[in-house]
């Protein structure tokens, strides 16, 4: 989800409408235009490397994603590359105390916290979705992961003391309301 002045938004770039190069270019341009905080579950170990290798394949550029203070001095101490900074929060890595032995599956933690989890899906289906060009199934699967990550992130903010219980509940309800409006 994207959270800004207009509220919560969830949108996807699907190969049903765009090429892989267009999807990657749109995604990477967000870092140059908006400088968002990136929240992921295992994003440092899996998602970002895959995205970046595919971006290299397509000859794309992502200067803001790699900037460690050369372009923007504020990124010297808060950038996307350093796992201990907060420009990119890999919630799985943080909750594992940056120790790979403690990594947990998104589905397990989502279900443990009472969130939907993967609803019977798994990442093992992804190659088949791509091979058979089942873009809607792939998009739905990825959006489910994004929503579970968002809900876990909200719970993490509560754990950290950055959200009060009533604020946490408001965000959960706002997310549910948003999803109901979209369906």
PLM segments and residue spans:
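Glycine/proline-rich loop-helix segments at beta-alpha junctions forming the active-site rim
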Residues: 172
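Short, basic/hydrophobic alpha-helical segments
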Residues: 20-34
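Metal-dependent phosphoesterase core characteristic of DEDDh/y 3'-5' exonuclease domains
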Residues: 1-17, 35-140, 144-167, 178, ...
């Amino acid at each position: 989800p994207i959270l800004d002045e207009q509220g919560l938004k969830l949108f996807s770039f699907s190969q049903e409408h765009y090429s892989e190069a267009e999807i990657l270019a749109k995604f990477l341009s967000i870092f140059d235009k908006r400088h968002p905080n990136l929240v992921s579950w295992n994003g440092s170990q899996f998602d970002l490397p895959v995205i970046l290798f595919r971006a290299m394949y397509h000859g794309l550029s992502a200067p803001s994603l790699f900037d460690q203070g050369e372009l923007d001095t504020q990124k010297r101490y808060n950038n996307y590359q350093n796992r201990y900074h907060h420009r990119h929060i890999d919630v799985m890595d943080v909750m594992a105390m940056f120790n790979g032995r403690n990594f947990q599956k998104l589905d397990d933690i989502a279900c443990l916290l009472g969130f939907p989890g993967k609803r019977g899906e798994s990442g093992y289906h992804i190659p088949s979705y791509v091979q058979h060009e089942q873009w809607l199934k792939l998009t739905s699967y990825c959006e489910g992961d994004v929503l579970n990550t968002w809900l876990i992130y909200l719970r993490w903010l509560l754990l950290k003391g950055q959200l009060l219980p009533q604020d946490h509940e408001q965000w959960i309800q706002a997310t549910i309301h948003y999803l109901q409006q979209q369906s």
